């Protein structure tokens, strides 16, 4: 009979977190869920964040989807990323919710996107649909910080997208805007509206938005480190 797993305390440092993540490499979602006595959803359509929550549980993360990093005390964000058999990302990566009001004085240096991406523990997970969720395995972890070129690309896109928000043009932004960073609606249903600024500076109600990393940003990042 399997011994149930008790979630660890938050890691004391980066090395401890990385070693914990390495221990998960090669294990399947089914094995991890069984040890934690957690039910496995039939698929991820309604439980998009399930894989991330399962790995957070095993690594002692605490932030959930709050603005701070998952491991705020050691300055690290956890990002799971579904990949195909070649290690190529299968979808964009959610970074954080975009603030649609109260943005006076905000700069790249002080924004949530930069804080979240300053140090990331990437964990690739098998994500091809033909592999049943329970059989999908965890890949080797990677600790990453943006290099100068990556940071510049992110900053440029963030500033362009924030200009749309501040100037009341948030509803003009499409998925085509941004070279590596996208601004997209983030709501499970279209009735969940939030306040934003309209073209004439008036309050409007619109869908919540989130910042997402494009696959053309995460693919080379993974390829460089895993020599895909």
Curated annotation (Swiss-Prot):
The keyword Nuclease applies. It comes from the Bacteria. InterPro entries: DNA_mismatch_repair_MutH, DNA_rep_MutH/RE_typeII_Sau3AI, DNA_rep_MutH/T2_RE_sf, Restrct_endonuc-II-like. One of its GO terms (cellular component) is cytoplasm. The keyword Secreted does not apply. GO terms for biological process: DNA modification; mismatch repair. Keywords: Cytoplasm, DNA damage, DNA repair, Endonuclease, Hydrolase, Nuclease. CDD domains: MutH-like (cd00583). SUPFAM superfamilies: Restriction endonuclease-like. It is found in: Cytoplasm. GO terms for molecular function: DNA binding; endonuclease activity. It holds the Pfam family MutH. Its main location: cytoplasm. Belongs to the MutH family. NCBIfam families: mutH_TIGR, PRK05070.1. Sequence-specific endonuclease that cleaves unmethylated GATC sequences. It is involved in DNA mismatch repair. HAMAP family: MutH (MF_00759). This is DNA mismatch repair protein MutH. It comes from Photorhabdus laumondii subsp. laumondii (strain DSM 15139 / CIP 105565 / TT01). The gene is mutH.
